[in-house]
Amino acid sequence: MSLMVISMACVGFFWLQGAWPHEGFRRKPSLLAHPGRLVKSEETVILQCWSDVMFEHFLLHREGTFNDTLRLIGEHIDGVSKANFSIGRMRQDLAGTYRCYGSVPHSPYQFSAPSDPLDIVITGLYEKPSLSAQPGPTVLAGESVTLSCSSWSSYDMYHLSTEGEAHERRFSAGPKVNGTFQADFPLGPATQGGTYRCFGSFHDSPYEWSKSSDPLLVSVTGNPSNSWPSPTEPSSKTGNPRHLHVLIGTSVVKLPFTILLFFLLHRWCSDKKNASVMDQGPAGNRTVNREDSDEQDHQEVSYA
């Protein structure tokens, strides 16, 4: 049994050595923007590509271009590999959709799956719109709220951002009313407040936005019966996705070997137990017969 367990353990070890790097090699890295993906004109932005796979190089590419691919050697810190790409002071020709890739030492010309796309937007190019709330900036809990973004400029699209959230909502501008173009953003029943801003843009330059509207603080008063967190609000019950991915992957790999080891131990213990019972069988029978004989003698004495 011992030789079999050792053999299976060796097979499993070499299988893991061959399979684990390939799985990690296929896993896509993550791409972040610092200080954020909405960048004012002439402001510096850094794009960070990172992964829990130990990539040797990272590549950064902007969609629609062929000569803008950047390549950096990855830094390995605390089980994470990363590279920081500085794209300089923000200009209109630097705005767009970016993705990054990773490569490992033994396959320098083969790349991982691409990261999720990251849209880098330049702001501050046009006149700022106005942002207002209906029925007002202070509402009762559960009361419906609509934010209206409007401008004298003929923007095709309006974008609404919430402080602390990564993504924006967008709506097409409606017909011109009283000399202004407007888009309404229904927020539904109010459960929590927040600070909002809006921007305007044109169809032919979707990554070039206007200046930000003045911030609008929406306050909610009262205690709603059912208050739900924002979809982007982190839950205390939700762990780090990277750590969960590694934990689940390791558990799946270990499970077959654990089952096999349990089966072999169970079989070995069963064989040992059966052998022990067979050795003790005759002695057990003799003991039972002796007790029966004593009982019969006792009964004979009682009735004599």
From Swiss-Prot:
Membrane topology: Single-pass type I membrane protein
Signal peptide: 1-21
Compartments in which it is found: Cell membrane
TM helices/strands, residue ranges: 246-264
Cytoplasmic side: 265-304
Region (Disordered): 220-239, 275-304
Ranges of residues in domain Ig-like C2-type: 42-107, 142-205
The family this protein is said to belong to: Belongs to the immunoglobulin superfamily.
Function: Receptor on natural killer (NK) cells for HLA-C alleles. Does not inhibit the activity of NK cells.
Protein name: Killer cell immunoglobulin-like receptor 2DS3
Taxonomic placement: Eukaryota, Metazoa, Chordata, Craniata, Vertebrata
UniProt gene name: KIR2DS3
